[in-house]
Regions:
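Conserved donor-binding/catalytic core segment of Leloir-type glycosyltransferases
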Residues: 143-174, 182-184
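N-terminal pre-catalytic "stem/leader" segment of glycosyltransferase-like enzymes
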Residues: 1-56, 194
Length: 362
């Protein structure tokens, strides 16, 4: 097949939904073209894959594909219509929703990350298939751990409100158990104080009266009294190595229970497991379907579950979690799902073991 991807090329969404599958589709003998703003020329494909809603010109491209009998696939890893006001991308997303819904309806097939999101998307298009986000094993090499216990979080600037969920427990447990708390990726500045200063200089005090600004302020207030190590965001091609270099023993994935988050996937779990860390996540969707170690979204539950993991045999737990990811969320095994739907085989259902894993009660 000649496969053309119409996408931006700088985000984690592109990495998981575009770059990783493209690499392994190429290994299977397919031609994969990345048609982005940097592209200068391309050949007419057998299938065009559109990602999210980045380019208004995509509507014209879809019309051209229709005239030339080219299969159209639309992929999204988020319910963009449910993005909350405190999300960094809220305003930008609102302007793209009409395009998002147009592309959803126009596609011959829609692909996405979880069954929850697939069910949501079927209101626009019945032909939705789940491709779980899948790691590239080539990118992950666990590093030797030191005697210092390291508990941390890695992610994007869209999680200030989510992170705040766990910080009271982190502060209390850190008083009893000596561990280093690590934060990575929530901004590009060299420190969180610099981030706040830059935002204040650029947008003024009114920013901090918005839902986003209030979530940043709440996060910074909760962080007080916690000993932490900070690492800024890195380019997407450096991210796997950066997560491994953090040498986390426990990776946390706090997440508010809201409609947008319920349609996300468990990327943090996959990354932590591949880097050699045990995951502790909020007991909410999507984590409650896959992650073995979860906590209710309150201080006492997070405190209790974190203390349990600090005293547990984390080597064995991590081995089990990494094994599950390598079995069920490995692009080497899952690339056939992409191949089948891109070729037009809508009958290829996702095996149930790829949709979810049984999780013990917390």
């Amino acid at each position: 097949m000649n496969i053309c991807l119409l996408t931006e090329t700088q985000s984690g969404c592109y990495k998981w939904r575009g770059a990783i599958p493209a690499k392994y589709l190429s290994r299977r003998g397919h031609t994969v073209q990345i048609f982005s703003k940097q592209a200068r020329s391309y050949e007419a494909p057998d299938v065009l894959v559109l990602y999210r809603a980045h380019y208004p010109e995509a509507v014209k491209v879809v019309e051209w594909c229709r005239k030339n009998n080219i299969r159209i696939v639309f992929d999204t890893d988020d319910a963009l219509d449910l993005v909350p006001p405190e999300n960094l991308n809220y305003k930008a997303v609102q302007t793209r929703l009409p395009l998002y819904e147009t592309l959803l309806r126009a596609a011959d097939a829609v692909t996405t990350t979880t069954e929850a999101l697939a069910s949501h998307l079927r209101r626009w298009n019945p032909n939705v298939t789940v491709f779980p986000n899948s790691i590239d094993p080539d990118e992950w090499t666990s590093q030797p751990r030191s005697s210092e216990v390291r508990v941390g979080w890695t992610g994007s600037p869209t999680h200030f409100a989510d992170l705040a969920v766990a910080l009271d427990a982190i502060r209390e447990v850190q008083k009893k158990h000596p561990f280093q708390f690590v934060l990575q990726g929530i901004c590009t500045e060299s420190s969180l104080d610099e981030m706040v200063a830059v935002l204040r200089a650029r947008f003024g005090q009114p920013l901090f009266d918005t839902p986003l600004g209030r979530s940043i302020k709440h996060f910074m207030d909760k962080l007080r009294g916690i000993r932490y190590e900070f690492h800024p965001n890195v380019p997407i091609d450096q991210h796997p190595q950066k997560v491994c270099d953090l040498k986390l023993d426990i990776g946390i994935a706090p997440l508010l229970d809201d409609p947008f988050n319920r349609h996300k996937s468990c990327i943090k779990y996959y990354e932590y497991a591949m880097s050699g860390a045990v995951t502790l996540a909020s007991h909410v969707l999507p984590y409650s379907t896959e992650v073995p170690n979860t906590a209710k979204n309150n201080r006492e539950s997070w405190k209790r579950k974190l203390e349990e993991l600090l005293q547990a045999d984390r080597t064995a737990l991590c081995r089990e979690q990494r094994s599950w990811v390598m079995t069920h969320r490995n692009i080497e095994k899952n690339v056939e799902l992409w191949e089948q739907v891109f070729a037009g085989d809508q009958g290829s259902a996702l095996p149930m073991e790829l949709v979810s894993s049984p999780v013990e009660a917390y």
